[in-house]
Design a protein with these regions (language model features):
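Short acidic/His/Gly/Ser-rich catalytic and metal-binding motifs that mark active-site loops
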Residues: 166, 172-176
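C-terminal terminal-subdomain/extension
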Residues: 255-311
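A cross-family acyltransferase "interaction/gating" segment
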Residues: 169, 179-278
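Hydrophobic/aromatic ligand-binding patch that stacks against planar heteroaromatic rings
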Residues: 139, 155, 193-197
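Generic beta-sheet signal
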Residues: 126-128, 166, 205
């Protein structure tokens, strides 16, 4: 998985310190106040470290009925194949991602997982740093959301949890609406190495409908690079969409009011990587076969839909 923005900042700050170029230090000998960059990076790292105990089963139990009702009425969420997920033990759930920063597919699946397996089963969802540091971050943490990193995911898996990861991240979630029915992980294979290292099965989770909750126009990757957002905030894109209440929404930093598109999620059969690919598996082959299978499943879901939004 990619290095977090805070991790990159900490690494840069450390290199500056070693090279004597730390802008936060003054005078000969490097005396003076610590680098603002280092202090900021350390603070962000502390906030984003996976606190698995932040997940609150009682809180989930209290809020699940109303949240599921609201989600069902607005998105008409339908989740199929939950019985394919192993009943216990660690598992890596790998999904395609849609809907900008609102990500209704995550909401629908998270609620369904807790309803099906019970709130006591440990279940964590990996999310972008900006989500965890937003005003709704504390609420999401209580539902099991942690910052997306290899370390956080491994910690949860080692603890016996089910972990939901979206390899496509901010790239896939902001793909243009006319590419709605496309799996696009942007070549990111960290989830495969994570599953191999942790010795857990992969369960693909394919969803459709999220990219109909707004009109997504562009990833905005050139603009993000020009503004150095990839370095500062770990953002590879500065997407543009047409959505309420902003009409023209640049960055989707504050989210948007999603259109009530029907969200359908299909859970696929679990994959034991060692059993299927041997003790020295080819990561490229695994990636190609998993994404191809997920694309075929997404194509089937797309064929079922009659009209955008209505499903």
């Amino acid at each position: 998985m990619a290095e977090t923005g805070a991790g990159a900042a900490a690494r840069v700050a450390e290199e500056q310190s070693r090279n004597g170029s730390d802008p936060g230090r003054r005078g000969a000998g490097g005396f003076g106040r610590p680098s603002l960059l280092r202090r900021l990076a350390n603070e962000i790292e502390k906030r984003l470290a996976a606190d698995l105990d932040a997940r609150d089963p009682d809180f989930i139990r209290e809020n699940l009925p109303l949240a599921w009702l609201a989600s069902s009425l607005w998105f008409r969420g339908e989740v199929r194949g939950m019985e394919r997920i192993p009943e216990s033990g660690p598992v890596l759930l790998v999904g395609n991602h849609s809907g900008g920063n609102v990500t209704p597919d995550t909401t629908v699946f998270t609620l369904a997982f807790n309803a099906y397996f019970g709130v006591e089963r440990p279940f964590y969802q990996l999310a972008h740093n900006l989500v965890l540091t937003s005003p709704i971050g504390p609420f999401l943490r209580r539902f099991g959301t942690v910052a997306a990193s290899h370390e956080n995911a491994r910690k949860a898996l080692d603890g016996g949890a089910a972990v939901l990861v979206y390899p496509g991240g901010d790239w896939e979630v902001n793909r243009p609406t006319w590419e709605s029915n496309r799996i696009d992980f942007a070549g990111r294979k960290g989830f495969i190495r994570l599953a191999l290292d942790a010795g857990v099965p992969i369960v693909p989770v394919v969803s459709i409908g999220g990219q109909e909750t707004a009109i997504f126009l562009t990833h905005g990757e050139r603009l993000a690079k020009f503004l150095r957002l990839d370095k500062l905030l770990r953002l590879k894109t500065l997407p543009v969409n047409l959505s309420l209440p902003w009409i023209v929404n640049v960055g989707d930093f504050f989210g948007h009011l999603p259109l009530p598109a029907k969200i359908t999620v299909q859970v696929m059969e679990p994959i034991d990587l060692r059993e299927r690919y041997g003790e020295d598996p080819d990561v490229e082959r695994i990636y190609d076969e998993i994404t191809t299978a997920m694309q075929e499943q997404l194509n089937e879901l797309a064929e079922e839909r009659r009209l955008p939004i209505l499903g």
